[in-house]
Amino acid sequence: MDVETQEIRQARQRASVKWLLSKAFNNRVPDNLKEPFYRDHENQERLKPQIIVELGNATLYCQTLANLYSDPNYQSMNHWSIIQTLARKGVPVAESADMPITETVLIQTNPLRINAHMSVIESLMVLYAKEISSGDRVMAAIRRISGNNYQAPTGQSYEQALLGWISHACAALKKRIIKEVDAGLPDDNGSRLQTPDIPPVRDFQDLCDGICLALLISYYCPKVVPWTSVRINYLPAVEDSIHNILLVCNFSQKHLPYTVMHMTPEDVTYMRGSMKLNLVVLLTDLFNLFEIHPAKCVCYPGMDGQVPHSNSFGGGLNRRSTPPNEYQTVQSNNFDGNHAEAFVVHKSRGITTLASMHSQQQQQLHQQQQHQQQYHQQPLQQHPSQSQLQIQQQEPLVPARLRQAKEKTNVESKADERGRRSRRNSSSEDSQLTIENFGGSQDQLNTLGRYERDRERKLSNTSVGSYPVEPAVAVRSSIADARGTLQLGYDTDSGSEKQDRETEKYSMRRQVSVDNVPTVSSHNLSNAGSPLPVARHKQHSSDKDYSSNSGMTPDAYNDSRSTSGYDPESTPVRKSSTSSMPASPAAWQLDVGDDDMRSLENASKLSTIRMKLEEKRRRIEQDKRKIEMALLRHQEKEDLESCPDVMKWETMSNESKRTPDMDPVDLDKYQQSIAIMNMNLQDIQQDIHRLATQQSQMQAQHLQAQQLMQAQQIANMLNQAYNAPVSAYSSRPPSRDPYQQQLHHQQQQPMPMPQPMQYVNEHGQYMSPPQPAHYMPQQAQQPQSIYSDNGAAYNHSNHSPYGGTPQYRSSVVYDDYGQPTNHFYLHESSPQPQAHQHPQRRTWAHSAAAAAYEQQQQIQPSLVDVNAWQTQQHQKQKQTWMNRPPSSAGAPSPGSFMLHQNGGGGGGGGGGGELQHLFQVQASPQHGQRQVSGSNGVQRQQSLTNLRDNRSPKAPQNMGMPMGMPMQQEDMMAPQSICFIGDEEDVDELERNIIESMQSTHISDFVHQQQQQHQHQQQLQQQQRLQGHSGRGSSSEDYDSGEMISNKLNITSGNLTYRIPSPSRPSIQANSFQDPRAMAAASGGEDQPPEKGFYISFDDEQPKRPKPPLRAKRSPKKESPPGSRDSVDNQATLKRESLSHLHNNNNIGFGNDDVNSKPVTRHSIHGLNNSNSVKSPGNATYNKYTDEPPIQLRQLAVSGAMSPTSNERHHLDDVSNQSPQQTQQPMSPTRLQQSSNNAEAAKNKALVIGADSTNLDPESVDEMERRKEKIMLLSLQRRQQQEEAKARKEIEASQKREKEREKEEERARKKEEQMARRAAILEQHRLKKAIEEAEREGKTLDRPDLHVKLQSHSSTSTTPRLRQQRTTRPRPKTIHVDDASVDISEASSISSRGKKGSSSNLTGYGQLSSNSMKRDYYRGSQDSLTVKESPDDYPSTSSTPIGRRGSYKTSREPAGVERGRTLSRISVAKGSTLNFRGRKSNSLMNLCGPKLYKQPAAKSNRGIILNAVEYCVFPGVVNREAKQKVLEKIARSEAKHFLVLFRDAGCQFRALYSYQPETDQVTKLYGTGPSQVEEVMFDKFFKYNSGGKCFSQVHTKHLTVTIDAFTIHNSLWQGKRVQLPSKKDMALVI
């Protein structure tokens, strides 16, 4: 590279910067940046300032990474973070010795260190290439192309893989060509085709002739670039090469959704090796657009004779041939891609479990047979699994992107994989895109990323509400962008690159480009479930479970997928038209069938109104979706087709939208209409919310009356939820609701389930109430799922990402609508119109929670005896626990039913979980979490602890399994109180403190037991509370704390998003805060079967809701663990585990019951009043952050039997939340440890920290509020004090500065006075000398008033100048005197040509005649100084009257040889220590200090001119004659001053002139030039530097004695005319 020319370097820089811009702007580069360089006035290429700035602040790098991984977390990194990220990804930035890559270097913008930035850009290019071509993607493509079972050589690099891809494509094309030739097809000219000799591709050098690049395009796009247009010669000429590469360029510009060719044809042809990386990136982009996200123009004709049927999945590839409907359906359904590829790792694909693979294999033939039939029969509703299987049949034709992601095929549970992945080398296939590589755990990343993504999506969408519709890609502006970037199957939703949901969101969701990857499969469902953090964990297990189920039967498999399809991701997929989901209320009904709407009977009118509103909202949403879809299409017409997922989901959402080009409306119109719709949706939502609240209140009363009938009522509620939700869902394309995806697959069931009503938050986000998992046929099939159990459905539902809870979800749906007052208010004030939450930033999770909340309330009356459920669950869970997908953990089997517990109390284990899921799904999991439990702002630390607990795989849960409940003790999905979660540091500190205290107190040992007990108690309490706050608890609980944390705890509370990355924190268990003894006691109760009484105590009065601000405003320890609202106080004490339990408790129990109690406590601080929490009198922890009075660490189950309710609740929690999680979650070391603790804790987890609902009386709420106000006041005071201290410091500093300035001025003033004094003395002395000299020479001064003038002049002009003496330099370039000085004595003044001093030659110190040759020669000896030159006049040599400073370098002579005229000045300035040769007065000057005045003699520059003529003007032997003549003329002349005339600035001698300063006459003595030169003729002036032997130009307008040479205007030379512009060229000025 050392040898590379500037041209090559510039070409590479241009191509690389263009590539960077395309990726940073998601392939939509602004027009003004399409060409990154511009040419400046010197014709130099410069990078545009905007790009320089964005390189300097790392914006472009951040955007590139964010788009590449669909992860907004990359948006705020600095250069160093980016370099570290690249290194973690296995692409270290190359440094050179001369250019280290550091933040300091990269941040520079003036000048920009382009080489350093090139290193970073090239590393990004390598990363991009690796990510796109990593794993088996390329291998799968090669297999499809070649038709054989190609196996990539081990150790093959991504570059070799890409070359192999091109090589195989060219070989396949050659086969095709041979067939054409054999068929005798003529070419365009009618002549017979001949088989071309396609050169082999061994390295990138072979691509430089453009043949293989063009043929590659011809292979994929034969209609656009026929192979006959490629010039193939054995010895390619440069012309042919450029022609071929031009084909590539034109194809890129005209036929691809965005240009990928950033090089010019010449770059490729000539640069060869130096452009290799740019070529690699070009191939990568082409691979992306041909294989991963095929562009419109891509078709695969005659893939080895296998032309995909239009309805075959291959047809998907052959996009053109497939009817959009079928194709899309197929694609959306075929997430798995080819079965054969089951073990192929594709980032874009979901994980396939062995079971699922097995089932797929078994089903493959069957499905193949049904393939076309199915496509036609259920183009829209087709089950993903079916379509997948079908697709699998045609695997050879499936583009690599359709293949399952490795994770899908992965046998390991998600949790296991997650644990593994985080440690994996970033370049490994698995982890490449995972955020974990960036330092987060997968879980965290998922929830977090998803949450943020959702948020961003919402923000980025033209309309917030519209977001779900065509999910705006988080960071990506569009699918195209998304597609352009690596959407390797990562969900945008999932913050993690790979999000556990691995499933790139069911394509439906198309959240981000990732969604586009169809690879998401049912397995992904489980992943989809992961949207809820809880769901995710559970899903990990559930993945396996699903796969097992799927293995059992195709239906089961599909169902499980469907269930998981509930996954927010999957829901979006929405196979049927927008209304299809809602249209299939049957699905809901399947599960809910029994529950008629009896529970709603009381609110039938409200329901009717609400239904109408929902219908209206649904229509608006549909319209909005259409518009958004159209907008997206408009933006990315090309991309849509290339992205099957998008197509899929668009078709699903709206068949009419099939054509990507569909109604391209102006962006403005789209945006306006969307904005209007959002407003309408918000209004409707608020109305619905209000209705829901009323309804829920009515229901709450009703429920109290009908607690015995809860089971039926629940069913009814579910039905209602289904129906109403259906409209909601229908209103929103399931796909839009990332979380709703859950049931999308469930639609697979014969009857698409109506999606619960989707709520559009104030933010316009769709909130879908949770949908019952029942959609899944499995649910129906499984007895456990029996609706009566609700849990049973849950069991199946559990498979759904959300856990079986989807059914509950339906109940949760109510939450969407508005949570009954008793339900937990997702938004701290559920009762308030959602608008109130709006400020908080209600996410759909909120809305969903609200709806679910309502539903739950409604359902609660019908809630089956939760305890009974729990018991059933307990048993079933034990049985099914292992099988149950982790998601089910949230809503364990029938136990899951506890959803309501959760919902009502913890939503029961499952119910709450479901709600949670719902919420989480709807919001980012984190969001949901926070919203759920944080809605009150008081989410408990629980989220933290839950997270931690959740995190732990909870192997111990298995231990607890028998108990089931204990297992559930921590509902991973349990919502966590986020209120406690504030800053990461706070959380960490809390956890540390808690852990330490636990260790010190040995509480941890008991914590598990107690926690479990506690949980049981709490569950009971929660149930009660749930009744009071069911909605809230459930949502909180549902939030798997683990999930939350795993999700990095992005907690959104209101407008605040707290990101708490605590991926591996040990979970705090509720017990941790408990007294160990109490815990032990509690543990006993745990075993007791939960009683079947589900206490739903809905007080008519809604508990006072803590002020919403609570959440937003946190004291420095921002959210202490929920358990310790006090935690500020308690933090040290509370242990992390405890916290978990606390959280569970606080947040409606980690276990659901924990969550119930706590969230209830917290959430509903108001609601808590209703619930009976068991308090352990002894432990009173006071959470500052909770509204409640000091929370008492309740040992809910001090006696195991403590209260059946608590046991039940505990049981439910444990079972529903914990078991699945435990079994499924892989344990991180911490987790294992904790898990074991948790397992025990699960048993013992009885500790409930939180104010009992009974405790929460209005006074305590007031007290809490007062406390909050107090805290706020304190913080305000602190802030004020800080500001005052800051102000004081500033004032002091300014005073100090003032004093220093005054001192400085004083010093300067004294100096000036001293100088003035010295100047006055000097002037007097000078005057005296001048008079003496004049008398000596017998001359009289020309002007009698010379003295006065001199004095006045010196006093006026010297003083200021003297100040500059300090910095004096040799002599000024010119001596120019102001008028005052000129007047001093015309005789002596030489500075102004018009008033040259008197002709009298005042010789001061020197006795030599002023024009003596010797003295002239050594200018230094010159003593004829005019008055003007007096040091006083120019005390600083460098400053002349006009203020110009002559630098020593530019002065004509070195100091030693300074001419007399400057000498005096210099000597004064320098202290006259310089020894000037030939100057007799030097010694005198040295003695005197400053040189005294002497009557200046007319100066002569004779010596200078002689020197110039000798050494400069006529150098060398050639000019000897001319030199002699000039020297003679000078010798003969009597003139004192000589000037040389030059032709121009080149200093070519033309003539010698004499100058009379007195008369300003310039007369020619010798040479060529005008005989007399007038002032107007002068052009430039020069003076001679006798030391440097050169002339330097003097920028002055007048001739003075300091000038030694000049030029005259060009026009004066004969034959030269000034070039006037021709009139023709002149612009006509009108």
Curated annotation (Swiss-Prot):
Bias kind Gly residues: ranges: 902-914
Q: Single Gene Ontology BP term? A: negative regulation of microtubule depolymerization
Effect of gene knockout: RNAi-mediated knockdown reduces circumferential microtubules (MTs) in fat body cells and reduces msps recruitment to the nuclear membrane. No effect on the radial MTs or nuclear positioning. However, simultaneous knockdown of Nin and Patronin, impairs both radial and circumferential MT assembly resulting in defective nuclear positioning. Simultaneous knockdown with Nin, also results in a further decrease in msps recruitment to the nuclear membrane.
Return the PROSITE patterns for the record: CH, CKK
Q: Where is the composition biased (Low complexity)?
A: 358-394, 576-587, 738-750, 872-896, 956-967, 1008-1036, 1218-1230, 1382-1400
- Compartments, record wording: Cytoplasm, Cytoskeleton, Microtubule organizing center, Spindle pole body; Cytoplasm, Cytoskeleton, Microtubule organizing center, Centrosome; Cytoplasm, Cytoskeleton, Microtubule organizing center; Cytoplasm, Perinuclear region
The CKK domain, residue ranges: 1489-1623
Region (Disordered): which ranges?
311-333, 355-446, 486-589, 726-753, 872-967, 1005-1042, 1055-1186, 1200-1241, 1284-1315, 1335-1459
Question: For the modification Phosphoserine, which residues carry it?
Answer: 422, 431, 441, 460, 463, 466, 494, 496, 513, 530, 1034-1036, 1067, 1219, 1228, 1398-1400
Where does it mainly reside? cytoplasm
Task: Tell me which stretches of the chain form a coiled coil.
Answer: 601-639, 1277-1343
Looking at the keywords, is Repressor present? Answer: no
- Gene Ontology CC terms, in alphabetical order: anterior cell cortex; centrosome; lateral cell cortex; microtubule; midbody; mitotic spindle; perinuclear region of cytoplasm; spindle
Write down a Pfam family by its short name: CAMSAP_CC1
Keywords for this entry? Cell cycle, Coiled coil, Cytoplasm, Cytoskeleton, Microtubule, Phosphoprotein
Q: Where is the composition biased (Polar residues)?
A: 319-333, 432-446, 513-529, 919-947, 1065-1074, 1167-1184, 1401-1412
Q: Where is the composition biased (Basic residues)?
A: 1105-1116, 1363-1374
- What interactions and quaternary structure are annotated? Interacts with msps. Associates with the minus end of the microtubules.
User: What the record says about its domains?
Assistant: The CKK domain binds microtubules.
- This chain belongs to the protein called Patronin
Q: Which organism is it from?
A: Drosophila melanogaster (Fruit fly)
